[in-house]
UniProtKB/Swiss-Prot annotation:
Protein purpose: Gamma chains make up the fetal hemoglobin F, in combination with alpha chains.
GO cellular component terms attached to this protein's record: haptoglobin-hemoglobin complex; hemoglobin complex
Protein name listed in UniProt: Hemoglobin subunit gamma-1
GO biological process: cellular oxidant detoxification; hydrogen peroxide catabolic process
UniProt keywords, alphabetically: Acetylation, Heme, Iron, Metal-binding, Oxygen transport, Phosphoprotein, S-nitrosylation, Transport
Amino acid sequence: MGHFTEEDKATITSLWGKVNVEDAGGETLGRLLVVYPWTQRFFDSFGNLSSASAIMGNPKVKAHGKKVLTSLGGAIKHLDDLKGTFAQLSELHCDKLHVDPENFRLLGNVLVTVLAIHFGKEFTPEVQASWQKMVTAVASALSSRYH
């Protein structure tokens, strides 16, 4: 797990306060499903995922993306205990859903890309470094249940 400096925490929290969770969440999950199509197998119940436009316009993708980012927002308040914060989600994704833990890393990287697109020049290399540290730590926390 990454150690977060006070500067990291301030940088992450500051940008998070400006994130539109619904838009960024839907775009992040949508892009994951388009760029890494093998991840679609976990979302059979979401209906039409046959093309990029179908995925990006799918209301279930948008809703789940918002749910994912809402969960991430809660974790931002507990950066020093991400493993504890994500213990139940790790168990669910490992034991019940059998999600490949590599997918958490991919999703984090897609989120960083989406934030860069949304925030442009405000998403400086320093901001990116703090966010990359955070999504890496979250992916590690979500993978903690895996053996």
